[in-house]
């Protein structure tokens, strides 16, 4: 039977931020069985607003987006939803911005095209690691 199961624990919430609508759609379709997708942002400003409204457990953020890119999104999301774990997404294998994003608070980095199961695992691990860092 498909649908809501009141006995099952709630799925973790996920915010997706990528300027490419095809990527946003594919990520949503790929991850909707393991996560409750609470928003799909096209730029840093929209990602911050959606994070403030939904307080997601984890945010998957593209490095290169309009409105300040992933760096602005991570700083802004950290300000409005400090418990949200951030995972950086990039098409480039060696993106020079990734180091800055990790320093800014990203929990992990993945490349676009990562296998769906591996991506879900990275997102879950980021959520598990976030409370330990927040408590430290």
Residue ranges: model-predicted function:
Residues 40-58:
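Acidic, metal-coordinating helix/loop segments flanking the phosphotransfer/catalytic sites
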Residues 57, 63-64:
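The short loop immediately C-terminal to the conserved phospho-acceptor aspartate in CheY-like receiver
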Residues 1-13, 120-136:
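Non-catalytic signal-transmission and effector/linker regions of two-component phosphorelay proteins
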Residues 43-46, 67-72:
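Acidic catalytic/metal-coordinating carboxylates
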Residues 7, 21-39:
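Two-component/phosphorelay signaling modules centered on CheY-like receiver
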Residues 49, 71-83:
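Short amphipathic alpha-helix used as the core "switch/output" element in two-component signaling
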């Amino acid at each position: 039977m498909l649908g809501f199961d009141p006995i099952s624990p709630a799925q973790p919430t996920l915010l997706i931020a990528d300027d490419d609508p095809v990527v946003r759609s594919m990520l949503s379709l790929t991850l909707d069985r393991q996560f409750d997708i609470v928003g799909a942002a096209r730029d840093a400003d929209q990602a911050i607003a959606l994070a403030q409204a939904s307080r997601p457990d984890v945010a998957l953020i593209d490095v290169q987006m309009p409105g300040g890119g992933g760096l602005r999104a991570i700083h802004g999301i950290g300000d409005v939803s400090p418990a949200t774990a951030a995972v950086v997404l990039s098409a480039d294998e060696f993106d020079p911005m990734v180091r800055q994003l990790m320093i800014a608070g990203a929990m992990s980095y993945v490349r676009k095209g990562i296998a769906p199961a591996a991506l879900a695992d990275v997102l879950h691990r980021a959520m598990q690691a976030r409370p330990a860092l927040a408590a430290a």
